[in-house]
């Protein structure tokens, strides 16, 4: 999960985290 957060921006982190998870 850490590598995803580093690749995603703070704003996209919420959408990416909810979408991927």
Swiss-Prot record:
> Where does the record locate the signal sequence feature?
none
Q: Which residues form a coiled coil?
A: none
Q: What is its EC number?
A: 5.2.1.8
What does the UniProt record say this protein does?
Answer: PPIases accelerate the folding of proteins. It catalyzes the cis-trans isomerization of proline imidic peptide bonds in oligopeptides.
Tell me the enzyme class.
isomerase
Name the reaction it catalyses. [protein]-peptidylproline (omega=180) = [protein]-peptidylproline (omega=0)
For the region Disordered, what residue ranges are annotated? 1-21
GO molecular-function annotation terms? peptidyl-prolyl cis-trans isomerase activity
Give the superkingdom in one word.
Answer: Eukaryota
Sequence similarity: Belongs to the cyclophilin-type PPIase family. PPIase A subfamily.
Q: What is this protein called?
A: Peptidyl-prolyl cis-trans isomerase
Give the record's keywords alphabetically.
Isomerase, Rotamase
């Amino acid at each position: 999960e850490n590598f995803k957060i580093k690749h995603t921006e703070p704003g996209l982190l919420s959408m990416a985290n909810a979408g991927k998870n």
